[in-house]
Amino acid sequence: MIDMLVLRLPFIDSLVCSRLSGNDLIAFVDLSKIATLSGMNLSARTVEYHIDGDLTVSGLSHPFESLPTHYSGIAFKIYEGSKNFYPCVEIKASPAKVLQGHNVFGTTDLALCSEALLLNFANSLPCLYDLLDVNATTISRIDATFSARAPNENIAKQVIDHLRNVSNGQTKSTRSQNWESTVTWNETSRHRTLVAYLKHVELQHQIQQLSSKPSAKMTSYQKEQLKVLSNPDLLEFASGLVRFEARIKTRYLKSFGLPLNLFDAIRFASDYNSQGKDLIFDLWSFSFSELFKAFEGDSMNIYDDSAVLDAIQSKHFTITPSGKTSFAKASRYFGFYRRLVNEGYDSVALTMPRNSFWRYVSALVECGIPKSQLMNLSTCNNVVPLVRFINVDFSSQRPDWYNEPVLKIA
């Protein structure tokens, strides 16, 4: 699906001026004039107050703002123009969220996604929209996202952990951008950035953030979004999903042969898809091809102890003063269990204080795990090919209850 679309709409020629900067001719617009014509607010780096009461401002700029839609927001920013940046308005959003309130799955229709951004932008800011040469709109970035499905969240987490050490060729893991449920490759690349992450974890985080807001302070689209995200069927579909996201930038789009002009790209996509192919899926495959070669022949040690974790959590939990359930103690016991699996019963017994070891063993036995089982845990039969869990099935990216979204204007 198209998970992010970044478009740049240049200003009409009559508003664009030029100045010489060294040997470069720089195109720019007068931001104060744009603000007057469109009613937009600007920020000033310097404000000077004179004794006669006059104010002088300099260093005008426009910060990113968010336009509300039915389900989500569209970010936009006015760029004055610079050596490497033609004066324009940049708009960006997740078309999936704008169209349906979530990005667990979604459309690969470039025309529909573009329409969702442009029409909402035009409807919200008609005066600014009229100052732009919409026909010259260019694509700055497309995020193409597809998912592999692990048997459960426990195994999906192990896949992410294994991927942290996978690199190939020019595709390098960006360790500073790796989180517990996310791995990033080539974060600073001007061509494409690749990301793998757990969708169910992200979805739960979004629900938690929205639910923590007082109802009176929630916008109408946040309330709609929370309603959509709380759908049990959606949460069930997201469970076990390992997302592979390609953040594809202009240089990589051009190397694939995609025109950067939005409307030329839409025509290109229509012709391309009419041949029984899918442009967005092939862009995604092209982006991940080098990394996926590293998966060939690779294997990982998989353990499926979700039932054990459930048993431990059902026995060892506490209720905090705020009324929330804490599984801190259960996590320690499960970590001990994983040590038994990886190092063996006798080895762990030799490296822990005797009283602590028996206390942890007793805690696991209380959960219904026989001591004889704890003494004979092994990982030797759990080595499986990595590609078994990195199988992205294009035909099963959406549930059977999916319908192509219909555009709603806020």
From Swiss-Prot:
Spans traversing the lipid bilayer: none
E.C. no: 3.1.21.-, 6.5.1.1
Catalytic reaction list: ATP + (deoxyribonucleotide)n-3'-hydroxyl + 5'-phospho-(deoxyribonucleotide)m = (deoxyribonucleotide)n+m + AMP + diphosphate
Keyword terms of this UniProt record: ATP-binding, DNA replication, DNA-binding, Endonuclease, Formylation, Hydrolase, Ligase, Nuclease, Nucleotide-binding
GO BP annotations, alphabetical order: DNA replication; rolling circle single-stranded viral DNA replication
InterPro entries per the UniProt record, alphabetical: G2P, G2P_C, G2P_N
Domain of life: Viruses
Claim: Hydrolase is one of the keywords in the record: yes
Chloroplast recorded as keyword: no
One Pfam family it belongs to: Phage_CRI
GO molecular function, one term: ATP binding
Record function comment: Isoform G2P plays an essential role in viral DNA replication. Binds the origin of replication and cleaves the dsDNA replicative form I (RFI) and becomes covalently bound to it via phosphotyrosine bond, generating the dsDNA replicative form II (RFII). In turn, viral DNA replication initiates at the 3'-OH of the cleavage site. After one round of rolling circle synthesis, protein G2P is linked to the newly synthesized ssDNA and joins the ends of the displaced strand to generate a circular single-stranded molecule ready to be packed into a virion. Isoform G10P protein binds to double-stranded DNA and prevents hydrolysis by nucleases. Additionally, G10P is an inhibitor of DNA replication and may have a role in the transition from semiconservative replicative form DNA replication to single-stranded DNA synthesis in the life cycle.
Protein family: Belongs to the inovirus G2P protein family.
Record's protein name: Replication-associated protein G2P
Name of the gene: II
